[in-house]
A protein has these predicted regions:
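Helix-loop junctions on the cytosolic side of multi-pass membrane transporters
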Residues: 20-30, 199, 206-208, 215-244, ...
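Cytoplasmic membrane-interface "Motif A"-like loop-to-helix N-cap segments
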Residues: 109-120, 325-340, 419
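Juxtamembrane intracellular "pre-TM" segments in multi-pass secondary transporters
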Residues: 32-46, 230-268, 289
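Substrate-agnostic recognition of the 12-TM MFS/MFS-like secondary transporter fold
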Residues: 51, 55-72, 85-107, 111-114, ...
């Protein structure tokens, strides 16, 4: 068993221990007798969680399935120049930034469930566009891909939180904290499984386009289930364009965005998630450079390393649900600040490490921080943003992040590491 296999086994064991701890038998002493009304509400809560997480699994699978192969299809199957590939990637981020200010507002007005279906349609168009060799169609695909990414990180969460509140599930055992942590864990597991499935499809079909068709299937399945099982919710009901209620809603959104707490969240998410995006793009080159300096010439086991990172992130999401950290919003704020410090220290240390194995461990710490960050940030946003403007605010929060990523990527230059990038989509 080599170094990376041993680390993956240890991280998998740690996650197994967390799983057993979270699902251990408990002897609850109820403070009141359960009534006939309590039991149906618990059933409704469990059904709500399962219905949402099933759809969420499909939509993140659609994202993860195609991510590792986008660059390969552009560069090697379609024989596009490196500069053209870079422009296609940048166009997707620009599209996401341009759609951020209004995508969520439209979701609030026309319905979050409708917006979730729109994500499936947009991402389906992105997958179909990859089958074409026409450069204009490829740009159209990236355009819809940017919109889909904005919708993925805003409307699904907005629908879930609002539906949770409308169903009055706060008193059940299914807490928002649990749902947020499950989302991060599912994203990690789906990433690993999608990587294995995608590789198998490529080998079986002898084409890097096969994962995009599988991704299209996930979008179709998610869209059908949303229409069949989800009910619609809105940012505000019975508001017409130009009406006083509509103006009040716009004012409420503006007040929310200029709220110091929300402004702090915008800055924090831009810095942390922006750094995360850059890390996703550049960790293979960093580890590859360290390996070359160590005198090794064989290729990195990128699949094992990526699986280890996902296990580290799963462990972080499990830590985020520990009992002592879920009850107080101030505790959540303090924990998030502590995570920023740890992640910053890990990034700083990684720039000074020349040993491949030490660098890998520093990267695992960063991924663990990512696993803690997303459930905590989601919990804070659910508390400070009103349901009536949640979709619009959530999508607008992604505007600075997309601008940051586009600007930084326009300034990056190749270093001494491997020249061929290894692209994954997102980490949530």
């Amino acid at each position: 068993m080599n170094f990376y296999q041993a680390n993956l086994a240890i991280l998998a064991l740690v996650n197994a221990c967390f799983f057993l701890y979270r699902h251990r038998p408990r002897n609850h002493k109820p403070c009141h007798r359960s009534t006939q009304e309590d039991e149906p509400k618990e059933v409704i809560a469990v059904r709500f969680q399962r219905q949402f997480l099933l759809v969420y699994t499909l939509v993140v699978a659609a994202d993860w399935l195609q991510g590792p192969y986008t660059y390969a299809v552009y560069k090697y199957e379609k024989q596009l120049a490196e500069q053209t590939v870079a422009l296609l990637y940048a166009f997707g981020f620009v599209s996401g930034a341009a759609s951020a200010p209004f995508a969520g507002q439209l979701a609030d007005h026309y319905g979050r469930r409708t917006a979730c279906v729109a994500y499936c349609v947009c991402y389906g168009i992105t997958c179909l566009a990859m089958l074409s060799y026409n450069l204009k169609i490829l740009y159209v695909g990236r355009f819809f891909g940017g919109i889909a990414t904005t919708l993925l990180f805003s409307v699904f969460e907005a629908w879930m939180i609002t539906e949770y509140h409308l169903s009055r599930l706060e008193e059940t055992r299914v807490s928002l904290c649990t749902v947020f942590a499950s989302m991060t864990t599912i994203s990690s597991i789906t990433a690993v499984c999608s990587g294995v499935l995608g590789d198998g499809l490529v080998q079986y079909c002898d084409s890097s386009l096969a994962p995009f068709l599988a991704s299209l299937g996930c979008c179709i399945g998610a869209g059908i289930f949303i229409l069949a099982a989800w009910r619609e919710n809105y940012g505000s009901t019975e508001t017409c364009k130009g009406s006083p209620e509509s103006q009040t809603l716009k004012l409420r959104m503006l007040v929310t965005l200029v709220n110091p707490q929300v402004a702090a969240l915008v800055f924090a998410s831009c810095c942390f998630e922006g750094s995360m995006y850059l890390f996703v793009f550049f960790w293979p080159a960093a580890l590859g450079s360290a390996r070359v300096k160590s005198g090794y010439q064989d290729d990195l086991p990128l699949g094992l390393i990526f699986s280890s990172f996902m296990c580290a992130m799963m462990a972080g999401s499990s830590i985020s649900t520990t009992r002592n950290a879920l009850f107080s919003n101030s505790i959540t704020m303090d924990t998030l600040s502590f995570i920023f410090i740890i992640a910053s220290a890990a990034f700083a240390v990684s720039t000074m490490l020349g040993h491949e194995h030490l660098l890998f461990w520093a990267f695992c710490v960063i991924e663990g921080c990512v696993g803690i960050y997303f459930p905590r940030m989601a919990l804070i946003k659910s508390n400070v943003v009103d349901d009536s403007v949640r979709g619009g605010v959530y999508s607008t929060l992604r505007l600075p992040l997309n601008i940051f990523v586009v600007v930084v990527h326009s300034l990056d230059r190749d270093g001494q590491g491997p020249s061929k990038p290894f692209h994954f989509p997102r980490i949530q």
